[in-house]
Amino acid sequence: MNVVDRVSLDIGGRMNICVFGAGAIGGYVGAMLNKGGADVSLIARGAHLEAIQKNGIKVMFKDGSEVVEKMEATDTPSDLGHQDYVIVALKAHQAWQTAENITPLLGPDTAVVTMQNGIPWWYFHGFEGQYAGLQLQSVDPDGKQWSIIGPERAIGATVYPATEITEPGVIKHIYGDKFGFGEPDRSESARVKALIGAFEAGGLKARFYPEIRNNIWLKLWGNLCFNPISALTGATLDVVATDSGTRGVARAMMEEAEKIARRIGVHFRVDITRRIDGAASVGAHRTSMLQDIDKGRPIELDALLGVVQEMARIVDVETPAIDTVLALAKQRGRTQGVYPVFPELEEEDEVLTVD
């Protein structure tokens, strides 16, 4: 029996869940799971960690209600022991950088839930044929997470709520309570059922998707174009999605991405026009990449777009629009000192001299 088929929980026992990265989303998830009866612990750092240790996590909702949950919080994973689930709520490059730190939490049956934007490192686990077991260097250089964590532990996730940290230990809920989960092998396993049950017990909406990769791509479809275009132009989401020039660039990138995804079996349940119009309806939203650029934080360019280019090379799809925007966004990131986030990916460009 493999790890996907096993759940180490005793019936009626409390589920041990560690949220690795108790930021805006991770803290929100941890508080709601703890409220629902799971035994939750948090990995955090700095002033946020100190506030959680002192006062617990507070989640504030639009209707004025609050959830305050006290639980164990630390910056030292070895304090916590083996878990039933580890929810990794970090950005893709942070998850890669801290992969070794997760190992004290991993028992024989521990599942690792990946809550990153973009294509996950385990993506080709469970595939058959020519793509079976391919490892993506753009999000997992040298296969670090693949070897340290192991793809058999992975449960895929798509995250739809929006939250923000307003002060250490305090999270503001902006909208949404839906989460999607799925196994890389598409099975409705005991462990994914138990995870969904824990989310529902905490008042969250969780659903099993046998084709979780479809959900991952649908969310990525917008992120791969809107994020870098906004970072390059400084424009908010409504402008990027309605201006004829930037809308055209976004459409071209999405068309290329759709060709890539369809070659590896992905089905899109909406068309490009509907996806772009949906982004326009969000309004004057500053994308996460634009916010990161402005605040001097590392950008998720490899996980949102670099990996798409890598997959294009794997499936032999030409991507002129993606290549152009990626090259420009990389240079913007270098200029601002927020890229690369994976030094191993940086290659020396050929230098041409002109007399």
Spans of features found by a protein language model:
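Internal alpha-helical scaffold of NAD(P)-dependent oxidoreductase catalytic cores
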Residues: A51, L105, W146-K219, C225, ...
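Hydrophobic anchor at the start of a short beta-strand
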Residues: I17, D39-V40, V112, A154, ...
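Rossmann-like NAD(P)(H) cofactor-binding subdomain of soluble oxidoreductases
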Residues: E66-T166
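NAD(P)-dependent Rossmann-like dehydrogenase/reductase catalytic/cofactor-binding core
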Residues: D10-G13, V239, R247-D355
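NAD(P)+-binding Rossmann beta1-loop-alpha1 motif at the extreme N-terminus of oxidoreductases
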Residues: V7-K62
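Flavin (primarily FAD) cofactor-binding/catalytic cores of flavoenzymes
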Residues: K35, A44, A99-I102, R191
